[in-house]
Design a protein with these regions (language model features):
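Histidine-centered phosphotransfer motif of kinases
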Residues: 1
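Residues in the helix-turn-helix
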Residues: 4, 39, 53-54, 66
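Short hydrophobic/aromatic patch on the recognition helix
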Residues: 5, 9, 54-55, 59
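Terminal helix-turn-helix DNA-binding modules in bacterial transcription factors
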Residues: 11-53, 72
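…primarily DNA-binding HTH/wHTH and HhH modules…
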Residues: 57-72
């Protein structure tokens, strides 16, 4: 069942499935931000965020930097 899978995933990876996916998305965004000149909303869309503002919040929470700070 779902709770069993969630527990096993967290036991294996140390984070919830949702957190794992979020981290992978932010990792992908870092590569895109460094290698392209795409606008922030385009990067957000490319990695699966529908809201670029929420993407920026998640990015800052995970990296400790704003998107702008990271890109400089």
């Amino acid at each position: 069942n779902d709770s069993y899978l969630s527990r096993e995933f967290k036991k294996t990876y140390g984070v919830s499935f949702i957190e794992y996916i979020s981290r992978k998305r932010i990792e992908a965004s870092k590569k895109i931000l460094k290698e392209t000149d795409l606008k922030v909303y385009e990067v957000a869309e490319k990695i699966g965020f529908k809201d670029s503002h929420y993407f920026c919040i998640c990015f800052k929470k995970q990296t400790g930097q704003t998107v702008k700070e990271y890109r400089v």
